[in-house]
């Protein structure tokens, strides 16, 4: 099963990073290939973890697919996880981890595990998954800069 991951160090607070990553409804505003997204079934469990359903339409290189995920956002763990409900995948799980840094800022890690049902789409995805994860992370970093500008902790050590 294909798996890819990317981690970046950013000057933003864990709260800012978590708010951005968990703001699923706004993904179409800054991730180009998400052409539509409906978020529903919002609830907060007894531990304060937020849950919702996301129904997305994704277009890439002439292919258009629809899929649904359950999204779990746990601020205390700095984790946002999207798990497949239905769609063109046999398996899909995207996990964001946001970890504070001692001197300010945070590390943001994204890991995606997936397997497409359609062999042609699987081959297209395999040829482009490194590009895709880089573009996803770049889209989030660009959106963070738009929303939060340069943070006081912009000189986060690498």
Regions found by a protein language model. Name each.
Residues 1-49, 103, 150, 158:
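Hydrophobic ligand-binding cavity/cleft-lining segments
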Residues 3-5, 53, 64-68, 91-94:
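Short, surface-exposed coil-to-beta transition loops
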Residues 9, 19-22, 72, 125, ...:
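Amphipathic alpha-helical interaction elements
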Residues 10-14, 56-62, 73-77, 88-90, ...:
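Beta-strand elements of well-folded, non-transmembrane domains
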Residues 17-21, 27, 54, 71, ...:
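Hydrophobic pocket/interface hotspot
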Residues 25, 129, 133, 137-149:
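Short amphipathic alpha-helical signal-transduction/dimerization elements
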Residues 39-85, 139-146, 155:
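Glycine-rich portal/gate segments that line the openings of hydrophobic small-molecule binding cavities
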Residues 81-135:
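Beta-strand/loop substructures that line and gate deep hydrophobic ligand-binding cavities in soluble
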